[in-house]
Amino acid sequence: EGVWLCLPDSTIGEEGRMDEIRLALRELKVQTVQECRLLDARCSLPELSVGLDEYQDLTDLIYDGNDLGYVLQEQGQGEPRFLEKFRSALEYEQCHDLKLALDIASNLNCYDYCPASDVERFGEEVLQKQGETVFRDPVLQGGIDLKAYGEAQLEQQGYLLNTAETGYIRR
C-alpha cells in the first residue's frame, strides 16, 4: 500500500536520485516520484505538521524534508543549544509548517537566545557592562537577586520566555 521515506538521505546516487528514494521507488514498483501519491507525512518535531495539500509536487516536499533533516542532523554546525534555540524560534514565529521552518533555520542567526539556566549570568553581565560598582563592594554583592534582575533585563530587552520555560528568545 505504501512505504515510509526516512529523511535526510545523505547519499546521492549516480543518477542524482537519493538512495532512500531509489529504494522506495523500487518497493512501489514505479520509476519516478511523480507516479506516487502522498498518503501521510510526519516530522520528528511535534510542533511542525506537513499538510497533505501544502505541496503541489511531492518532489518539493521530499527536498524540503531532506533539507530540514540536514539542518537537524548538523545541529547548526555544532552551535551550542541549537535545537533549543531552533524550537524556541519556531514557537516565537508561531511556525507550524515545513517551508517556514526551513526559512527560520536558514536565518537562525537573526535570533538571540538565552537559556533559562543562564539568566543569573545574563543579569551579572548587564551590571558589569553598565560599570556598576556592585561587584567591588562586598556589602552590596549579596544584596542583588541576579536571577530576578536578569529576568527583568531580558524582558526589558524584548526577549520572550518560551512555553517550556527553558529559554528566552528575541529577533
Feature-to-residue mapping (PLM):
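Short, extreme N-terminal segment that most often corresponds to the first beta-strand
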Residues: 1-11, 168-171
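Generic detection of long, well-ordered alpha-helical segments
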Residues: 11, 15, 140-143
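Short linear, low-complexity motifs centered on an aromatic residue
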Residues: 13-34, 157-170
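Acidic, proline/glycine-rich low-complexity IDRs
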Residues: 121-171
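Mixed-charge (acidic/basic) macromolecular-recognition segments
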Residues: 18-137
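Generic structural motif
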Residues: 8-12, 41, 149
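Residues in flexible loops and secondary-structure boundaries
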Residues: 13-15, 46, 152
